[in-house]
Amino acid sequence: MAGWRTVVVNIHSKLSYKNNHLIFRNSYKTEMIHLSEIDILLLETTDIVLTTMLVKRLVDENILVIFCDDKRLPTAFLTPYYARHDSSLQIARQIAWKENVKCEVWTAIIAQKILNQSYYLGECSFFEKSQSIMELYHGLERFDPSNREGHSARIYFNTLFGNDFTRESDNDINAALDYGYTLLLSMFAREVVVCGCMTQIGLKHANQFNQFNLASDIMEPFRPIIDRIVYQNRHNNFVKIKKELFSIFSETYLYNGKEMYLSNIVSDYTKKVIKALNQLGEEIPEFRI
């Protein structure tokens, strides 16, 4: 059974391994956490020493490890080369995915994202703008040749954060959005690898400098989870918003009629998307905020 705890380490310390436990040591105390309890390990400072045996065991247990830079921003995460015995078979399937199937799956995923943006604006009582995005949703075509996704995003972010807001601006709002999206991306990248796929080969994302094109495609409907937290805390500074973003690891969300932790939803959603792409009879899953 997968772990459930998100462990955040943000002070000078040493992390090591002993008898299936992560050992935390600093000048003041020593603590032990059984690996079976850990789902995510967030290393929020560069002032941490890890043993290679611990790293090896974290990979064995499929624990998501996120590394932060000297500004405490996520900069990398640990993923194994192969997370299942038949990864070569799955990679061969991935390379052979039919263009029309990729188009159908990608369009369904983006439709969910646009719909969730509309729903969230309605939740915030921006009913006119919500309806404008809903109209874009109803006019969405395969692979979105008219860029309705982009038009929706512009309406959405300008409604939430003001007409002068752009995603290129250097401010606390964008820093928080990027931080939250990176947390999401790391969760999806882990599940992509667990499914035996290469993270680099996406559906529509094809940036040669993006190592996580497929995870970037699949995570799209989940972005409004981050947007909601940032919007609710928009008057706070980045440090405060960042702390609130950690709630995505402990909150539950409605999925398939059940309240579930986000990591479990991400796992199920990703598996079903991959099965749909493999044409194994799985319907494209839905996620609604």
UniProtKB/Swiss-Prot annotation:
Assembly and partners?
Homodimer, forms a heterotetramer with a Cas2 homodimer.
Query: What is this protein's record name?
Result: CRISPR-associated endonuclease Cas1
Keywords assigned: Antiviral defense, DNA-binding, Endonuclease, Hydrolase, Magnesium, Manganese, Metal-binding, Nuclease
Q: Which residues bind Mn(2+)?
A: E149, H205, E220
Q: Which cofactor does it need?
A: Mg(2+); Mn(2+)
The record's InterPro entries line, in alphabetical order, gives:
Cas1, CRISPR-assoc_Cas1, CRISPR-assoc_Cas1_C, CRISPR-assoc_Cas1_NMENI
Look up the EC number in the record and give it.
3.1.-.-
**Which biological processes are named by the entry's GO terms?**
defense response to virus; maintenance of CRISPR repeat elements
* Entry function: CRISPR (clustered regularly interspaced short palindromic repeat), is an adaptive immune system that provides protection against mobile genetic elements (viruses, transposable elements and conjugative plasmids). CRISPR clusters contain spacers, sequences complementary to antecedent mobile elements, and target invading nucleic acids. CRISPR clusters are transcribed and processed into CRISPR RNA (crRNA). Acts as a dsDNA endonuclease. Involved in the integration of spacer DNA into the CRISPR cassette.
Q: Give an example GO molecular function.
A: DNA endonuclease activity
Q: Which family does it belong to?
A: Belongs to the CRISPR-associated endonuclease Cas1 family.
Q: Which gene encodes it?
A: cas1
Following inactivation of the gene, the phenotype reported is: Plasmid transformation is still inhibited.
Q: Which organism is it from?
A: Streptococcus thermophilus
